[in-house]
């Protein structure tokens, strides 16, 4: 049984913060393939407007998963915090995947 988790951090809540760090550890021990989104440098770029930041984050997120064959996975989990929840929802809709937990 193939399983994957994609982790979407918040703007001020990174992958090394307790909620995401320990959840990632649990998914790792359960044999999940894991993808970590790391778009904090985009969000912290003071030269970009919020609209440009969000556009660049969406481009980054899609680039990270464009070659993933989600059809081979029996279980797909999106783990997210704050702005990451928005991006996870947008990605799920864009990919047309209904069976995401």
What are these regions (language model features)?
Residues 2-74:
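Serine-hydrolase catalytic machinery in alpha/beta-hydrolase-like enzymes
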Residues 62-101:
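Primarily recognizes the serine-hydrolase "nucleophile elbow" in alpha/beta-hydrolase
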Residues 1-2, 83:
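A domain-start/cap signature at the N-terminus of enzymes
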